[in-house]
């Protein structure tokens, strides 16, 4: 233990002596550990029991779609699991298990630290991975979890990589604000490098937090008590960094002035970055502005109004490098927050959501934090899962005939080795992956096989699943199987995350957790209605995703739409998903891989389906439950099979009425070829699935998707970049 303590003078402690604690100190520790932790209001109730599918489109796959909760993750030694709620409250905010480290929590130990181990400030996080977690300053916090110490950023200052969040009192409203601040900071900073703690009022006064704080975030709406204000100013004078979020906290001669006309309204903000460039975005105003004060630091933001009201100020403080960035716009609030008053305000704020994160990252970087993207996650093994038990024996027999003696199926891009179990020694690369065939070895907090089964109501599609938590791209997983698999064993690859997601042409597809990611294998006879019109496949898949959501009872008005040729949109405003189709003709059959990705639970950086549901509930007083990716993948595959069958039976006329019901282009005016090209009006799709437009001179022309990109915001059709 001695050689694991780092001293200011670079020496190593030679000996640590044990100390007999006095009875009063022991009693104080006992009281601290017995404190009851207050959690936030309980989360959404579990979704109702799954219902069987009904009809063709109306209730395709009515399983347990309405469940937002995730399953538990493995528990870390010595700490509560980071992603597992410890009570009925919100994850990450309601754990009564506190792992206390005496050197921070006990006054006698602090005394001992000063006298016996002089100058010891901190223990090396890299060398002591199994020490109990330090919860100084978080007693009574709503479920703060023990931080993961391994891999934390090494700071030149020697301070622990802690970001402390102060929201004032322990009221329910304050705890809700704590959750919002935690959420947005987690989206912005390198979460492998920092740990976020709730700094309580008592702890702010009592505990030695300032020596172990890289950034203090003040997000209290109430006036800061004078004694706590004094602590915060002392921290700044020692070189501390402060971020104020819609708080009355101020310094350096600035005064916060109330402007009721601005309160909870959407305003246009001009933000000046450190390099002098400007970012313009829509923001939610707190109703306060900054006045007076000295010249500003590198960053500043003002409203685009006549007074150019100061909303973001950067204030250097003291001689040791202290500084604060103070904001009176709600950078911490998502567009769907309760303070956002109208659907139009929600739309405007969502359109600026990427820029909101850009501004916040610029501020955090200026305050010395890293906002670098986290490292690419390691690839994980594939799991072979079967949606129907009757598929088990035929598929395993087929597999036995097509693997070599080592259980390997090779293709030009990928080798799959089918094994009964996975060991950590097995190599996983984008070109070589193990496939675990024992279903008992499978578990995932992001994918429920039972939920998928309940919502899959197909006769052939999506029956055999290759599942991965992390893979390079689902588009390559089926490469060695697609030309050999029997058609009745519909194959689908599903992933939680992709490291090299693919879009059209050279485009990449971002694939964060919360996105429904899949590649489906479909066989289409050449001499069939759809075989003669293969471009329609991408339209059918986009339509299937929209119908998968809007055919659920109660969800009919969720404003999810299709955008030609291959996109899924929220209204005509923001992209929520997309489709990529690769087809190969062999003999009389098209072998088609349909890649599809759409945002279900990942609100940032743009928008997701559950955002639309939450906003719908707020505007209509409804109580619709959030949806799950596993449910919607199964429902979309179910709807797609029915759309294909209808198309094969009736041709385009069998599906176009539903497509036009949901598409965003009806009667839209566009220009052809370039911004100066002839004007035309969109009239529909032609017999092959290409876009048709009516020109001013009376002619109708067809526009091909692989030659043009559709720019919804400018109403233009322009050549696609090669």
Swiss-Prot record:
A Pfam family reported for this protein in Swiss-Prot or TrEMBL: BPL_LplA_LipB
Query: Under the GO molecular function aspect, what terms does this record hold?
Result: ATP binding; biotin binding; biotin--[biotin carboxyl-carrier protein] ligase activity; enzyme binding; identical protein binding
Q: What is its EC number?
A: 6.3.4.-, 6.3.4.9, 6.3.4.10, 6.3.4.11
Q: Name one GO cellular component term.
A: nuclear lamina
> Alphabetically, which GO biological process terms does the record hold?
biotin metabolic process; protein modification process; response to biotin
Q: Where in the cell is it found?
A: Cytoplasm; Mitochondrion
Report the enzyme's class at the first EC level.
Answer: ligase
- Known partners and oligomeric status: Monomer.
Stored PANTHER family: BIOTIN PROTEIN LIGASE (PTHR12835), BIOTIN--PROTEIN LIGASE (PTHR12835:SF5)
Protein name per Swiss-Prot or TrEMBL: Biotin--protein ligase
Question: What organism is this sequence from?
Answer: Mus musculus (Mouse)
Q: Coding gene? A: Hlcs
